[in-house]
Amino acid sequence: MSLTRLNIEAFRNIQFAQLIPAPGINVIYGQNGSGKTSILEAIYFLGMGRSFRSHLSQRVINNDNDKLTLFATLNLARGDSKIGLRRFRSGETEVKIDGEKVKRLSTLAETLPIQVITPESFSLLFEGPKSRRQFIDWGAFHADPQFYGAWTNVRRVIKQRNQLLRNGAVYTHIQFWDQEFVRYAEQVTEIRNHYVDSLNGLLKGIIGEFLPSVDVKVSFTRGWDSKTDFAELLENQYSRDLATGHTVSGPHKADLRLRVGNLPAQDALSRGQLKLLVCALRIAQGKLLKQQIDKHSIYLVDDLPSELDAQHRQLLLKQLTDTGAQVFVTAIDPAAIVDSLHTPPNRMFHVEQGRVTVVE
């Protein structure tokens, strides 16, 4: 799968741009503030309906416009597919796939799986478990068609349960919701656990390439003691949940644990090593997607030279090339990317003040 055409209109400082990307490595270069990261962001927005730059997500629409428009043609195994998205200042989003209106943004994610390696994405290991749950759930969503519905039901039940707790409901009023909660929680947990097991099979070899002297153990924690019956736990923890006003244990507390020896990876590794570990996780996830559903991810790699030294840039780009996926990578100086590739990039784009040109 690859993007064969991308139109960007009124997105950040890009008034209008049309790109015809190549299937392999696409290098996008330009000075800071030129708009090169906005191209990656537009691709991500088209696949997720939101920005990966969460602190700037309210300002995606160009100041002179009342809406942004993104359009892409995808080359898929079954033939070409067209995706269009409009976001209005009111917050309304309109999505079409092959001319048909789409109501759920999850349909975008299913159509256009995207992996992001940016300065912000390294928070996967530096911050709390939420981003690591999202990492697991991205893979579980693509790997198992039952996951989305089960996880949607988990969130619905937790919301209802927490409202009852805040209202001081007696346990007999909560018990009905707990029966649903247990059923969906166990389904979500089984899918997540199976996914992490599958990921581990690929991850060990990739981590060995990036961090050959480091033994990283990866495990999944479900959000409650695996030796404890979840229904019994919910009943026994009712008083605690009532006191806090929310559900303390469950799949919404799951985590992906990465350890080196007896220490969390965050404490045992340098910041540079942690960045390489995140890269390994993203590459493993993309490779697993290809194995499971025969679909490539699209990789968006932002400001690579500032994040990794020359040796590790070369290693990452080799790994990305070997996946066979389409890659968009940005830099201020294109030589920092080109010199790290074993073969010339498939296409290069120069960005200046929001204007994009192909470099022949």
Swiss-Prot record:
It comes from the Bacteria. One of its GO terms (molecular function) is ATP binding. The keyword Nucleotide-binding applies. Keywords: ATP-binding, Cytoplasm, DNA damage, DNA repair, DNA replication, DNA-binding, Nucleotide-binding, SOS response. Pfam families: SMC_N (PF02463). The RecF protein is involved in DNA metabolism; it is required for DNA replication and normal SOS inducibility. RecF binds preferentially to single-stranded, linear DNA. It also seems to bind ATP. It is found in: Cytoplasm. GO terms for biological process: DNA replication; DNA synthesis involved in DNA repair; double-strand break repair; SOS response. Belongs to the RecF family. It comes from Shewanella putrefaciens (strain CN-32 / ATCC BAA-453). ATP binds at G30, Q31, N32, G33, S34, G35, K36, T37. This is DNA replication and repair protein RecF. GO terms for cellular component: cytoplasm. The gene is recF.
